[in-house]
């Protein structure tokens, strides 16, 4: 530490530059011992960083509840129109899609590559890799609604329907939990439907190596065969760097298998670059079996991962991609 009376002028090589800068700032702002304040601020940052990383993922839940509040307000304001209109929720969907699309652009510089592979009309089954938090799919649904004017139905886990307050959100955005016959009916009606075969298990267990956790699930393939629709593979680059899960530990895996509820804590919320890639559609083939189609689809999703994702994923690299 140098004396404040010591000159910080030109030629004083013995005086460290940063110390001189601190003393100048102390004089400008009239604050004594600025260096101590800065050291204390640095200490607070070190202490609270882990807490911030654990809290940030729940900001997404906060945004979902804001969306739900908006939908309730919208419903009350349009209660009389409901009896006369079959498109009561179109205005709400457009508003919510615009807000989520804006969040995607600002926080993640979100992009979709291969949007032309989504049909303008007619059915298709979208199969996607499930991140720790599927925020990429929320963004993707917003893009589909804005650019295609279509609502993409999605199969959600049973526990999602038990979350307090979520029923209206799930209803407005056409989420369902099955069964297989319902999925086939939706596709035969000409709608888009999305399924993540890995589901919550993949969200919890997969990690920065982006291993696909589908087990022996092939029900989605049977749905595509029964409905005679193409399958479109989908993967979002850096989704595991945006949010990370501790669900791969033995305790949290046991808890999930026992109670079928994701108890594992998450951390992240980093503003990494997110790019969703849509692969070439896998056309309907009446000669293929569900097992063969499931394996073919898994290979297609894996090909997207191999082509577009750095393995293992790196949070800092994903952040720097925002500037590329």
From Swiss-Prot:
Topology class, membrane: Multi-pass membrane protein
Record topology, Cytoplasmic segments: 72-125
SUPFAM superfamilies hit by this protein: Glycerol-3-phosphate (1)-acyltransferase
E.C. number(s) listed in UniProt: 2.3.1.-, 2.3.1.20, 2.3.1.22
Gene Ontology molecular function: any one: phospholipid:diacylglycerol acyltransferase activity
Record's keyword terms, sorted: Acyltransferase, Endoplasmic reticulum, Glycoprotein, Lipid metabolism, Membrane, Transferase, Transmembrane, Transmembrane helix
GO cellular component terms attached to this protein's record: endoplasmic reticulum membrane; membrane
Transmembrane annotation, as ranges: 51-71, 126-146
Catalytic activity: a 1,2-diacylglycerol + a 1,2-diacyl-sn-glycero-3-phosphocholine = a triacylglycerol + a 1-acyl-sn-glycero-3-phosphocholine; a 1-O-alkyl-2-acyl-sn-glycero-3-phosphocholine + a 1,2-diacylglycerol = a 1-O-alkyl-sn-glycero-3-phosphocholine + a triacylglycerol; a 2-acylglycerol + an acyl-CoA = a 1,2-diacylglycerol + CoA; an acyl-CoA + a 1,2-diacyl-sn-glycerol = a triacyl-sn-glycerol + CoA
Superkingdom to which the source organism belongs: Eukaryota
Pfam families membership: Acyltransferase
GO biological process: triglyceride biosynthetic process
Glycosylation sites per record: 5
Active site annotation, chain numbering: 130
Activity regulation text: Acyltransferase activity is specifically inhibited by TMX1 at the endoplasmic reticulum, restricting accumulation of triacylglycerol.
Subcellular location field: Endoplasmic reticulum membrane
Primary location group: endoplasmic reticulum
InterPro entries for the chain: Plipid/glycerol_acylTrfase
Keyword Glycoprotein among UniProt keywords: yes
Residue ranges, Lumenal side: 1-50, 147-324
Function statement: Catalytic subunit of the alternative triglyceride biosynthesis pathway, which mediates formation of triacylglycerol from diacylglycerol and membrane phospholipids. Synthesizes triacylglycerol at the expense of membrane phospholipids, such as phosphatidylcholine (PC) and its ether-linked form (ePC), thereby altering the composition of membranes. The alternative triglyceride biosynthesis pathway is probably required to provide the energy required for rapid growth when fuel sources are limiting. It maintains mitochondrial function during periods of extracellular lipid starvation.
Family affiliation: Belongs to the diacylglycerol acyltransferase family. Highly divergent.
Name of this chain's protein: DGAT1/2-independent enzyme synthesizing storage lipids
Organism: Homo sapiens
